[in-house]
Amino acid sequence: MSIVIINNFGQYNHRISRTLKYLNIENSLIPNTTSFEEIEQMNPKGIILGGGPSIERIGNCKEIILNMDIPILGICLGHQIIADVFGGETKSAEIESYAQIELNILKENGLFKGIGDSLKVWASHKDEVVTLPENFEILANSDKCDIEAMKHEDKNIYGIQFHPEVQHTPRGGEIFENFNKICENY
């Protein structure tokens, strides 16, 4: 079984796939217009919702989030889509972030297992989740964004605002390996 990456047409979506391949994690990168039924037939062990330019171009992401009963990781726009589906709120950031930032890990969890209390990550966004959805907890923040990472309290649904797939997040591969372990143990 592989991880399916939903391409929301962001500049880094192909890097997610390449990073997973480098880590020997089988994956498929598919457009966000792929139907839920087609994805279900692929029998994925997990879903990654990639970044993208606009909440108006998210294809079938909401249906995927609501109907797939497997681990999901949303990155950047994917994080914002998860928040939206579960009743959170996304707004334009007071300060757009296009830089390496210091991530503060607030709670030990499977996604950041073995990482420690802080991590250098790459931020590339003009919008951010400002209201945490009900039944979610904040896993990490930064001085640029209060909700850098979140997790559903009862489901293996994670959202991260930053980009683990780029070289400016030196330990991003560990985050993907941890997500893969979450998928394998589900």
From Swiss-Prot:
It comes from the Archaea. The active site is at 76 (nucleophile), 163, 165. One of its GO terms (molecular function) is GMP synthase activity. Its EC number is 6.3.5.2. One of its GO terms (cellular component) is cytosol. InterPro entries: Class_I_gatase-like (IPR029062), GATASE (IPR017926), GMP_synth_GATase (IPR004739), GMP_synthase_A (IPR023686). PROSITE patterns: GATASE_TYPE_1. It holds the Pfam family GATase. The keyword ATP-binding applies. Residues 2-186 form the Glutamine amidotransferase type-1 domain. Keywords: ATP-binding, Glutamine amidotransferase, GMP biosynthesis, Ligase, Nucleotide-binding, Purine biosynthesis. It catalyses: XMP + L-glutamine + ATP + H2O = GMP + L-glutamate + AMP + diphosphate + 2 H(+). Pathway: Purine metabolism; GMP biosynthesis; GMP from XMP (L-Gln route): step 1/1. SUPFAM superfamilies: Class I glutamine amidotransferase-like (SSF52317). CDD domains: GATase1_GMP_Synthase. Heterodimer composed of a glutamine amidotransferase subunit (A) and a GMP-binding subunit (B). Catalyzes the synthesis of GMP from XMP. HAMAP family: GMP_synthase_A. This is GMP synthase [glutamine-hydrolyzing] subunit A. It comes from Methanosphaera stadtmanae (strain ATCC 43021 / DSM 3091 / JCM 11832 / MCB-3). The lineage of its organism: Archaea, Methanobacteriati, Methanobacteriota, Methanomada group, Methanobacteria. The gene is guaAA.
